[in-house]
């Protein structure tokens, strides 16, 4: 690559015009919920669609975990209009720039939006001509206790080890004349208690963070001029439901439906008080203006837009980013396996019939599989969506002390042992821990062929926090004890294991012996796993840099970290390629973790030393080639982009970010997980970002793996509060703008 003189004049106007995202729309009704359109904000998501003359929407909120750790929907809502829309002029529009969905025929307009500052959903209904008779029905399929089938239990944290007779407990619904209240009330005993007992942690149970006990969640529906008319029953997809129909007392030209949500641990009275408190803060017109301004500001942080062959790819990138932003204020992270936008499971995969409820998602609701979750959150750095990172970082902040209790109880040392399949209370997932365990088996270990000794994915979230500080100075002081604890676990635990085997805690070179270890779920029984070494080296050095850079460092902490660096072994290179480890016992899955030093750990890449070793690994390692794919969480496009392999990156991103199989093009899946597959979209976002912008040291590489034949404009973020806007047209870089201006000298063009 060569560095050219950049032309910066007259760039602001021509680049900024691309900040506003285009609306996405269709002009015919849908067949079923799989043809729904996402809508949301704050921590609320809706699937909105019109079917057989009715407008329907599912409503979901992050954190709505029941006793079994299923992430339950709030319900389904059905709106019927008389007179109805003229289907000849029907349009359903996602107004991206202002964050709302509209259904209209040019006369009638129904607008859905979620307040970004509080958990309130509004449906604004207007007509320019004849007044409307409006019926709104709340539909619920959990009006009685339901015994889960074996397959259905996969929506919970019991998954394949569900006890016989496991129930999804009923909701409580109170239909008053003008207001409907719905709630789910967890009892004192939940899967948390079963997990603690299973994992022999009753001795420290009272110390443990327990987010499920006495959790009450749900909401209240009301609308001016709506009164209760009838109770109805029916069946949608595979689920029977009961509904409560509210109708307008008289025809109206304007109507508003408001649904207020609340989640609270305690009792119903406390929950009801919180709900009422939120309702009192609602100021409809002000809240709508504030919400739309929030979305407008959001889109100005960054953008990607293309014409021609890549237009579909950048459009889907933008649509998926909208879905992620719907949980910007969430107390809980966006789940990789559907997020807030799952739909009826029988429409997910035509090859497998799922006669299950709308609450179903494969791989659980409260268990957060770290290898998958990380791909949802890495793209937020270059997007400049640092606030969206908080729910995921706070997830680990809230649970790491439970993981420290594991280490103390089982092994008598310090450090947070955070497993791969981890619950929202910081313990290993109940079935993955293993229900059939040999006598005397270490109670701290999972009895699972895929997950044993896989502890290093927590370090990626540690790095996200450190990178967020490096990018925009985000205050991460609350996360620093957690990061230290994660590092300390590896140092102390592998010395502990070595001491169990013999008299020495370190090898003959004074290095940790990382055995037994794991390279993802793939290289099991690994000796000095490359992915673990790369993670420990990168996070340790980044934490030292943070401590020194902020001036708040404790010298003893820095000295410890420097000592840890000296104890970390080197990654293994053989035959000119990065190896997954020195040795491993077996290959269990299809993750080529020998490429993790490229991403996420950025030890190799454009502008970095020894890139040929990493390229050789990508192109010639037999397992890396065998495992290559664009599906689901596969990361090959990221590695290709990071290594400047433009042709490879183009081929993979064309498949990865193509339209998904459902009507809304950013609903990918099910892949290896569920639909909409968020780690499919996340890995695609990362790949596109790396094709457009990479940073090595102080240098900013623009278009390092972007095909010259694809016209594109982008704005992305880099470290030190930097934003880069650039355009490629007809194979040439024609516009570049860097803020702050002093970083213009750091830009390297293709």
Positions of predicted regions on the chain:
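Non-catalytic carbohydrate-binding regions of carbohydrate-active enzymes
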Residues: 463-496, 557-585, 604-724, 728-729
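Sec/Tat signal peptide C-region and signal peptidase I cleavage site
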Residues: 15-19
């Amino acid at each position: 690559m060569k560095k050219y003189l950049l032309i910066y004049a007259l760039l602001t106007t021509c680049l900024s015009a691309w900040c506003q995202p285009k609306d996405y729309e269709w002009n015919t009704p849908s067949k079923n919920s799989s043809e729904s359109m996402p809508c949301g904000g704050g921590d609320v998501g809706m699937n909105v669609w019109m079917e057989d003359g009715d407008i329907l929407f599912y409503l979901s909120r992050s954190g709505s975990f029941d006793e079994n750790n299923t992430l339950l929907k709030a319900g389904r809502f059905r709106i019927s209009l008389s007179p109805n829309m003229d289907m000849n002029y029907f349009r359903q529009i996602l107004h991206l720039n202002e964050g709302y969905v509209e259904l209209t025929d040019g006369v009638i307009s129904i607008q859905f939006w979620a307040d970004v500052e509080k958990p309130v959903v509004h449906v604004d209904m207007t007509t320019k001509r004849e007044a409307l008779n409006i019926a709104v029905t709340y539909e619920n399929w959990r009006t009685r206790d339901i015994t889960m089938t074996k397959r259905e239990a996969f929506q919970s944290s019991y998954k394949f080890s569900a006890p016989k007779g496991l129930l999804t407990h009923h909701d409580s619904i109170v239909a008053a004349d003008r207001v409907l209240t719905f709630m789910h009330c967890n009892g004192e005993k939940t899967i948390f208690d079963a997990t603690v007992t299973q994992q022999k942690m009753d001795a420290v149970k009272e110390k443990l963070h327990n987010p499920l006990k006495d959790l009450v969640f749900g909401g209240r529906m009301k609308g001016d001029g709506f009164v209760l008319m009838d109770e109805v029953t029916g069946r949608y997809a595979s689920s029977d439901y009961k509904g409560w129909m509210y109708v307008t007392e008289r025809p109206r030209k304007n109507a508003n439906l408001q649904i207020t949500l609340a989640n609270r641990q305690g009792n119903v009275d406390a929950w009801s008080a919180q709900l009422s408190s939120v309702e009192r803060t609602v100021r409809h017109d002000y809240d709508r203006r504030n919400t739309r301004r929030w979305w407008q500001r959001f889109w100005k942080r960054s953008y990607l837009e293309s014409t021609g062959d890549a237009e579909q790819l950048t459009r889907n990138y933008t649509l998926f980013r909208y879905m992620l932003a719907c949980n910007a204020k969430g107390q809980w992270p966006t789940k990789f396996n559907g997020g807030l936008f799952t739909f009826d499971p029988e429409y997910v995969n035509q090859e497998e019939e799922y006669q299950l409820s709308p609450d179903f998602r494969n791989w659980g609701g409260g268990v957060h599989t770290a290898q998958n979750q990380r791909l949802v959150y890495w793209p937020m750095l270059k997007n400049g969506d640092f606030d969206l990172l908080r729910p995921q970082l706070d997830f680990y902040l809230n649970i790491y002390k439970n993981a420290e209790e594991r280490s103390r109880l089982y092994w008598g040392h310090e450090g947070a042992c955070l497993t791969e399949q981890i619950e929202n209370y910081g313990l290993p997932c109940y079935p993955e821990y293993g229900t059939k365990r040999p006598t005397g088996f270490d109670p701290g270990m999972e009895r699972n062929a895929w997950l044993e000794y896989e502890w290093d994915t927590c370090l990626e979230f540690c790095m996200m926090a450190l990178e967020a500080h490096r990018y925009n100075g985000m205050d991460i002081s609350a996360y620093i004890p957690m990061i230290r604890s994660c590092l300390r676990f590896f140092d102390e635990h592998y010395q502990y294991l070595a001491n169990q085997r013999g008299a020495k805690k370190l090898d003959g070179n004074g290095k940790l012996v990382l055995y037994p270890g794991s390279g993802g779920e793939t290289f099991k029984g690994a000796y000095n796993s490359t992915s673990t070494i790369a993670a420990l080296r990168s996070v340790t050095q980044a934490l030292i840099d943070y401590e020194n850079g902020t001036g708040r460092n404790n010298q003893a902490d820095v000295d410890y970290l420097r000592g840890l660096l000296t104890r970390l072994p080197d990654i293994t290179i053989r035959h000119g390629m990065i190896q997954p480890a020195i040795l491993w016992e077996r290959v269990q899955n299809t993750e080529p973790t020998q490429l993790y030093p490229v991403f996420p750990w950025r030890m190799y890449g454009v502008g970095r030393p020894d890139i040929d070793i990493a390229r050789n690994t990508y192109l010639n390692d037999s397992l890396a080639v065998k495992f290559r794919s664009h599906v689901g969480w596969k990361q090959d496009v990221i590695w290709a982009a990071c290594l400047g392999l433009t042709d490879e990156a183009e081929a993979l991103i064309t498949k990865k970010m193509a339209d998904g199989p459902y009507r809304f093009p950013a609903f990918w899946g099910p892949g290896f997980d569920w639909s909409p597959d968020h780690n499919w979209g996340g890995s695609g976002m990362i790949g596109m970002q790396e094709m457009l912008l990479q940073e090595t040291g102080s240098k900013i590489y623009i278009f390092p793996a972007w095909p010259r034949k694809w016209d594109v404009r982008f704005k992305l973020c880099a470290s030190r509060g930097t934003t880069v806007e650039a355009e490629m047209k007809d194979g040439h870089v024609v516009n570049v703008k860097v803020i702050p201006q002093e970083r213009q000298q750091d830009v390297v063009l293709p």
